[in-house]
């Protein structure tokens, strides 16, 4: 890193060429091994040095304003030389070789906020003790290190400002019980752990787990879940209220069952008092109705005034219950209310029955609290005062007004229906929740009427109006909700999910390719097909695995054989090295003796030395030649002995070269024990030892380069031989897996010509047989069977040898295959009754010729009739051919050759 390279980097990244004007510098991916040349860059705030070969931190003495330093993917082993960077906020040292955190406490880096030391070599608690001094570090990444000590939890707990922690990839993560809960409890300010944030719910559940275990944690989780659902519901209801502002109260979301239970428990006492008071007020209203319909037709003014006062008192009690007094808020009047009022004006009369109570409260009895007089609009003080004066004037004409209006009840029933269009009858709490907003339609005091007085009206109204009309109103309200598609219904369906959808698709018929199929049958059929495909794949993989394992085993066996051969070769080479070392020591001793006794050596003539060496060697070789001649005369000559006898016959030219080499080196003193070491008897008669002596003389004449070249060529030849051996073994393996299997599969003994001929022979012999000569016939068949069996085995063996010609190389090179592994086609021997107790010929019994019959068969043949014997022999001779005696000729030829070779050797010696 030089000033020139730094300026080139600035030019490349379009930075300032004036050093102190740059606040950021990009020196990453540059191959630097040290930090240098930054003295003039005093205004740097961000320095990028990642992906280099920096081994230590240095050269930052003038970077007092540095805020961010990126040194990841380097070769740093120690944190040092950062005391001048007092304003450093972010330090990235990941993917380095740091084994200990040091020199980064608050005394050196007082404002350090983010520290990344992931993918390093931190292991013990001592290497992390410096973190206790990092008071202002809020983001710490120590992932993918080698931390194993569980005490790291206490170190992290001492970091009061820690907010974000990444600890994944360390062995200690698996050792900490309840890893996430433990760290949340220990690190009080933690907001992000590994790859997930830490919410208040997680911390509350962790604290509950600490208090009472998993059961307490489950309860805390349920409590948080309910609270979240409650907040969501409140938010949706608030949104619905804002949307329907001015249109009346919207249909809001219902609370869950558990919240309803809590609300019921909380409001049980108040609701009981309300029902009691409401019942009392309704009881007073019914008594009032009875008195009204049972009064005399003339109408008494005083009694009417008394009844009006009683009704006023009951009305005031009801207003007290419903909160509709003069001090309450003004009620909202909807469009439906205006419509009802207009209709009520059309059917109004000249007088009214009371000042603060309409006919709806008297006509409809108490069956639902929505039908009671609790939904009464407030009445101002001026209205109440004026109504009291009007009651006195109109009390006398009550009966006349009732008789004039015959259709008043029907009109009020219609008004009752229109009223229920604006009330949600499905919500039993509608009266309590909406008592200040949803109001029953009113009629003006001057337009109110009294019901017609006739017998049985109360009974008829109770039977007809109470149940049927309420049910009809509910049905109309339900149909209206379905037509309007209210927001509450849509949200309710979204909250409940697909409760009304028929999900039983297994019983439905589906159409595939234009045909109807049962879902269960189609699914089972597809499952069977997938299972068959999977099973076929498993079988293929298993077969491939078995084949691969067999191939690996064969390779291991071949390697074992090769290593065994190499061991034998190395042992022989070690012996050769020992012999060469002994010969070298003798040569050194010869040179020393040559310097000491130079005069004595000069007196000896070279011809004399050569003659002595030749004489000694000829003496040693005479017994070997005689022994070789004796072995050559034998018919069964051992190949190893022939090789020794051939090698013992040393060429005359090689002998002269050996003599010349002895002359150059000089003779050794036979009396000196150090110069002439006794040769072991096993090497004295070994021609290989003599050959190695000659090779040693040739090696001494070569230079080092020539020796190296020769060894290289030998190594290359060994590699080529090894490669050829491998190819041969591969070909053999292929043969065993293909050709031999084809041979066995295609082998059909019934169709073999020899077997066909044997069957025809049996048919011929079976046509002219009598009971008298049955034993002779059995013997003839037995003899023919032996001959045909031997002939068939010879044929099959010849075919097998033709197929196994590839494997002959492996048997000679010491490979995997051998003669014992050749699974020859063999006809197992058996025993037959009576004369067939002799062992039958097989493919391995080739040495057994036709001329060596079984003794029992010979005895039986001698007892036969001469005429039958001649006839049988004639038939056997017809069937006999040259193929039944293949080894007889080979043995005779081998004996002839064995007799000729010793004669040739003796003549050559002479």
From Swiss-Prot:
GO terms for MF: dynein complex binding
A matching Pfam family: LRR_4
Composition-biased stretches (Polar residues): 314-331
Keyword Repeat recorded: yes
Protein localization: Cell projection, Cilium
Protein's job: Cilium-specific protein required for cilia structures.
Cross-referenced PANTHER family: LEUCINE-RICH REPEAT-CONTAINING PROTEIN 46, PROTEIN PHOSPHATASE 1 REGULATORY SUBUNIT SDS22-RELATED
Protein name, per record: Dynein axonemal assembly factor 1 homolog
Organism from which the protein derives: Anopheles gambiae (African malaria mosquito)
């Amino acid at each position: 890193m030089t000033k020139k390279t730094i300026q080139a980097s600035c030019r490349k990244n379009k930075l300032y060429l004036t050093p102190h004007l740059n606040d950021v510098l990009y020196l990453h991916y540059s191959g630097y091994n040290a930090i240098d040349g930054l003295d003039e860059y005093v205004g740097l705030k961000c320095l990028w040095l990642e992906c280099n070969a920096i081994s230590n931190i240095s050269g930052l003495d003038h970077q007092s304003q540095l805020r961010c330093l990126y040194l990841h993917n380097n070769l740093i082993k120690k944190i040092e030389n950062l005391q001048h960077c007092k304003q450093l906020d972010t330090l990235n040292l990941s993917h380095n070789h740091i084994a200990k955190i040091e020199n980064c406490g608050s005394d050196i880096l007082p404002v350090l906020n983010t520290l990344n030391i992931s993918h390093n070599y931190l292991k013990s608690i001592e290497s992390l003790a410096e973190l206790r001094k990092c008071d202002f570090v809020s983001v710490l990444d120590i992932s993918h290190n080698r931390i194993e000590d569980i005490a790291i939890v206490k170190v992290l707990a001492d970091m009061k400002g820690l907010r974000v922690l990444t600890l994944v990839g360390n062995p200690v993560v698996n050792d900490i019980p309840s890893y996430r809960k433990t760290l949340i409890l220990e690190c009080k300010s933690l907001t992000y752990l590994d790859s997930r944030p830490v919410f208040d719910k997680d911390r509350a559940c962790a604290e509950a787990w600490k208090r009472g275990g998993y059961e307490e944690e489950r309860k805390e989780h349920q409590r948080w879940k309910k609270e979240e659902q409650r907040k969501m519901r409140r938010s949706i209801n608030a949104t619905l209220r804002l949307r329907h502002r001015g249109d009346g109260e919207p249909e809001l979301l219902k609370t869950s069952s558990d919240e309803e239970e809590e609300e019921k428990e909380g409001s049980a006492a108040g609701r009981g008092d309300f029902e009691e008071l409401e019942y009392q007020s309704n009881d007073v209203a019914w008594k009032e109705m009875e008195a009204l319909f049972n009064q005399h037709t003339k109408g008494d003014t005083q009694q009417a005034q008394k009844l009006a006062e009683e009704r006023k008192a009951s009305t005031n009690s009801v207003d007290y219950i419903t909160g509709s007094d003069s001090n309450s808020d003004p009620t909202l009047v909807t469009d439906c209310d205006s419509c009802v009022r207009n209709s009520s004006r059309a059917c109004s009369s000249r007088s009214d029955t009371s000042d603060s109570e309409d006919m709806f409260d008297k006509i409809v009895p108490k069956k639902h609290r929505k039908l009671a007089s609790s939904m009464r609009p407030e009445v101002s003080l001026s209205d109440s005062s004026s109504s009291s004066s009007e009651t006195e004037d109109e009390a006398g004409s009550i009966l006349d007004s009732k008789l004039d209006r015959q259709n008043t009840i029907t009109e009020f029933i219609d008004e009752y229906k229109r009223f229920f269009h604006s009330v949600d009858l499905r919500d039993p709490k509608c009266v309590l929740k909406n008592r200040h907003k949803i109001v029953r339609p009113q009629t003006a005091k001057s337009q109110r009427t009294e019901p017609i007085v006739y017998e049985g009206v109360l009974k008829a109204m109770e039977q007809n109006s109470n149940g049927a009309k309420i049910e009809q109103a509910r049905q109309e309200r339900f149909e209206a909700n379905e037509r309007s598609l209210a927001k509450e219904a849509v949200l309710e369906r979204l909250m409940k999910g697909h409760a009304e959808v028929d999900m039983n698709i297994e019983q439905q018929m589906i159409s595939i390719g234009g045909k109807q199929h049962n879902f269960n049958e189609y699914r089972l059929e597809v499952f069977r097909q997938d299972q068959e495909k999977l099973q076929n794949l498993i079988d293929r993989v298993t077969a491939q695995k078995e084949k691969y394992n067999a191939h690996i085993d064969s390779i291991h066996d071949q390697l074992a054989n090769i290593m065994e051969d190499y061991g034998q070769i190395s042992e022989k080479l070690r012996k050769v090295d020992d012999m060469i070392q002994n010969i070298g020591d003798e040569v050194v001793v010869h040179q020393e003796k040559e310097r000491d006794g130079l005069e004595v050596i000069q007196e000896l003539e070279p011809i004399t030395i050569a003659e002595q060496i030749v004489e000694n060697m000829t003496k040693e070789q005479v017994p070997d030649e005689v022994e070789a001649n004796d072995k050559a005369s034998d018919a069964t000559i051992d190949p190893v002995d022939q090789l020794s006898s051939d090698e013992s016959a040393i060429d005359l030219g090689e002998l002269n070269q050996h003599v010349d080499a002895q002359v150059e080196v000089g003779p050794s003193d036979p009396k000196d024990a150090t110069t002439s070491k006794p040769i072991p008897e096993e090497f004295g008669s070994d021609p290989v030892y003599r050959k190695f002596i000659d090779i040693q003389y040739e090696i001494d004449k070569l230079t080092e380069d020539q020796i190296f070249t020769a060894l290289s060529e030998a190594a290359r030849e060994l590699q080529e031989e090894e490669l050829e051996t491998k190819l041969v073994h591969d070909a053999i393996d292929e043969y065993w897996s293909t050709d031999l299997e084809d041979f066995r599969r295609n082998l059909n003994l019934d169709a073999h010509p020899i077997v066909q001929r044997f069957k025809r022979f049996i048919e011929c012999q079976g046509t002219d047989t009598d009971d008298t000569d049955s034993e002779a016939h059995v013997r003839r068949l037995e003899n023919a069977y032996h001959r045909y069996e031997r002939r068939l085995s010879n044929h099959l063996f010849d075919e097998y040898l033709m197929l196994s010609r590839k494997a002959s190389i492996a048997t000679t090179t010491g490979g995997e295959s051998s003669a014992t592994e050749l699974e020859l086609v063999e006809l197992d021997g058996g025993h037959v009754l009576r004369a067939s107790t002799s062992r039958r010929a097989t493919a391995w019994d080739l040495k057994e010729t036709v001329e060596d019959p079984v003794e029992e068969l010979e005895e039986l043949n001698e007892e036969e009739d001469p005429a039958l014997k001649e006839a049988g022999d004639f038939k056997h001779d017809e069937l006999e051919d040259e193929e039944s005696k293949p080894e007889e000729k080979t043995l005779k030829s081998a004996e002839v050759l064995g007799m000729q070779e010793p004669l040739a050797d003796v003549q050559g010696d002479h």
